Regions:
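Extracellular/periplasmic metallocenter environments
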Residues: 32-33, 38-40, 86-87, 119-166
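N-terminal edge beta-strand
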Residues: 29-76
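Serine/threonine-biased, Pro/acidic-interspersed low-complexity stretches characteristic
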Residues: 4-5, 24-27
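N-terminal secretory/membrane targeting signals
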Residues: 15-18, 144
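Beta-strand cores of secreted/periplasmic/IMS beta-sandwich domains, seen most often
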Residues: 30-31, 66-96, 134-147
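C-terminal segment of classical bacterial N-terminal signal peptides
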Residues: 17-25
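Bacterial N-terminal signal peptides that target proteins for export
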Residues: 2-12
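The feature marks short-to-medium sequence segments in extracytoplasmic or secretory-pathway proteins
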Residues: 90-126
Length: 166
């Protein structure tokens, strides 16, 4: 049996503390702050602004999603979501784009994305105005869309891209 003087053992323990912190911080989730916004219930809702691989001009959108940062490394990502609307319920759903050159499957009669077919990875469900929620998901490298799937909102431009790198 090897005997270490108490002071030497204490010195080793203190020296190891920064390493323990590095391990836990390396495994911590990336935090993304998300704002769900709109220009008010009295604004006429824009249409035809859903994600399109060819590009779409979101400057006409009357509602949207802002995420910062817009990228993260693969692994755990925590989305802190706030509904900044004064009078409209919104939600945030994380959708994986298996092929970013294709639009999400849209159910026109219901004015929403088919979440099951689209690759739903998790959501912060229907937040009342001013409310917040969080979601932590493990994401692989690729392109994702953050969308609001309340009927009509996605087509009104309520989405943003989110990229996960290696």
């Amino acid at each position: 049996m090897i005997y270490f003087p108490r002071r030497l053992a204490l010195a080793f323990a203190i020296a190891a503390l920064p390493l323990a912190g590095a391990v836990s911080s390396a495994s911590a989730a990336t935090v993304v702050n998300v704002s769900l916004w709109d220009k008010g219930a009295d604004m006429e809702m824009a249409t035809g602004l859903q994600y399109d691989a060819a590009g779409v001009d979101l400057s006409k959108a009357t509602m949207g999603i802002k995420a910062g940062p817009a990228t993260a490394r693969a692994g755990a990502v925590t989305f802190h979501v706030k509904n900044d609307s004064k009078d409209t319920i919104h939600e945030m759903i994380v959708m994986y784009l298996a092929d970013p050159s294709k639009a999400l499957p849209y159910v026109a009669d219901e004015q929403r994305v088919d979440e099951d077919k689209a690759g739903d990875k998790g959501e912060v469900s229907e937040l009342d105005p001013g409310q917040s929620g969080s979601l932590t998901v493990n994401l692989q490298p690729g392109t994702y869309l953050l969308i609001c799937n309340v009927p009509g909102h996605y087509a009104a431009g309520m989405w943003t891209t989110f990229v996960v790198t290696k």
